[in-house]
Amino acid sequence: MQLNFAAREVAIKLVYYGPALSGKTTNLKALHELTRSDSRGRLMTLETKDDRTLFFDMLPLVFKADTTEGGAMNLRVKVFTVPGQVVHASTRRLVLQGADAVAFIADSQIAETENNAASFLDLRTNLKELGRSMRDVPLVIQFNKRDLPNVRSDAEIDDLARRGKEPVFKASAVHGKGVIESFFGLLDRAWQKLDGEHDLTRKLGIKPEQFMAKAAASLGYAGRERELARAHVGGSIIKKEGA
């Protein structure tokens, strides 16, 4: 994270992590398409001929909100994906460095269970090598490819979510379903963590719920931030007012 209090600007890094072909790049493409044009930059992708990410994808976004002091603040977000193939372990660690929050994109297909587990362990290992832990980094989990046959049932995913602390989202990124909800949850957890560590509410003059309402509008959900906040199983997203 980078803070410029004089300019009232915050820059953060979000990373989409997960096994190969779980839909990380598809999430970013859908996010780019669904976000309002004045809030998104150019999506940069570098793929091989078999549609696998070679190094990383990156999507720049900017969210603007009015402060209680009458000014405005900007949150600049760079959303990265990592290559899922085992041979790119060093690249994943490099991209993960400095991440303010992570979305783990799991493949819902039953046949991909072991790959999901191996990738999650890889995330834990890489964070440890970077001197961090899973407890230190805001995390959301997305089960993608819900439109395919032979996937984990909703009941199985719900049970898994209730046993964990992280919000779990269900998605079909290729159809744009669950993409905004997953990103909104990730952005909110990142903002809440940074606000707690750096007192952004006081220093920037904007409350988390105010900022997230503006972000929801930029994502095409004006006035519907509570709807987005309820789109997960387990975990928690937006704090209740007065809490």
Region spans (language model):
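Conserved G1/Walker A P-loop phosphate-binding module
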Residues: 1-50
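Conserved nucleotide-binding/hydrolysis micro-motifs of P-loop NTPases
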Residues: 21, 85-86, 109-111, 145-149, ...
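Switch I (G2) and immediately adjacent beta-strands of P-loop GTPase domains
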Residues: 40-88
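Conserved catalytic network of the ASCE P-loop NTPase/AAA+ motor domain
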Residues: 51-54, 66-72, 93-98, 129-135
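Inter-motif core of Ras-like GTPase G domains
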Residues: 88-111
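Conserved C-terminal guanine-recognition region of P-loop GTPase G domains, centered on the G4
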Residues: 101, 108-164
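Canonical P-loop GTPase G-domain recognition
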Residues: 137-140, 147-200
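C-terminal-of-GTPase-core extension/linker across diverse P-loop GTPases
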Residues: 177, 188-243
